[in-house]
Amino acid sequence: MLTMLIAGHDTSTALLAWTFYLLGSHPEIYRRLIADVRTALGAEPPGASSGWQPPLLDHVIKESLRLYPPIHIGNRTVVEDMEFHGQRVRAGERLFYSIYLTHRDPAYWQNADEFCPERFTHGRKAPPFAYVPFGGGPRACIGAAFGQVEARLVLGRLLQCYDFELAERNVRAHMGATLEPRPGVRMRVTRRSGQ
């Protein structure tokens, strides 16, 4: 558990920052999400074992991960010689792929650059390996489920108790170890009355 908390610190931070940026940039979705959270929680804090799963919050998290995957590059070692787009690739070589670009590929995603949490409603799924914010296959991130539960609990509680307004819209993606917002996501935070 401690390993997942420490290893996931930067990725969780990036996910939360990008989610607040997207919600601040899309006030109509933010308002719907606030209503969803308030209806689901009332005055009770969210709990991991309470069965609390507001669908819109889950869709917002998935869409944030699609548009701004904290780990934006993946890699795999080639196990046997192959040809890829006319180029010979030898066994043992390492191939890198862009999760960021895959998640924005119009061949897989309608309106690929738009923030549209509804694309995940009704159990809709992307084609295999078109949505891989935690990698895919046997080498997928062991903390994927934990990270999503953590995000749901943190976002649920913050949205339950505070109002957020985006203070600075001029944010760009910086591709470092994680995909981080630069110069950062600045929000005006107001405690909700009665909280």
Can you say where each PLM-predicted feature lies in the sequence?
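Cytochrome P450 catalytic-core helices
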Residues: 11-36, 144-160
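Conserved cytochrome P450 K-helix/beta-meander segment immediately N-terminal to the heme-binding cysteine loop
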Residues: 97-124
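Conserved cytochrome P450 catalytic core segment spanning the I/J/K helices
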Residues: 1-15, 54, 116
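Cytochrome P450 proximal C-terminal region
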Residues: 38-40, 140, 145-195
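Conserved cytochrome P450 K-helix E-x-x-R motif and the immediately C-terminal K′/meander segment
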Residues: 44-85
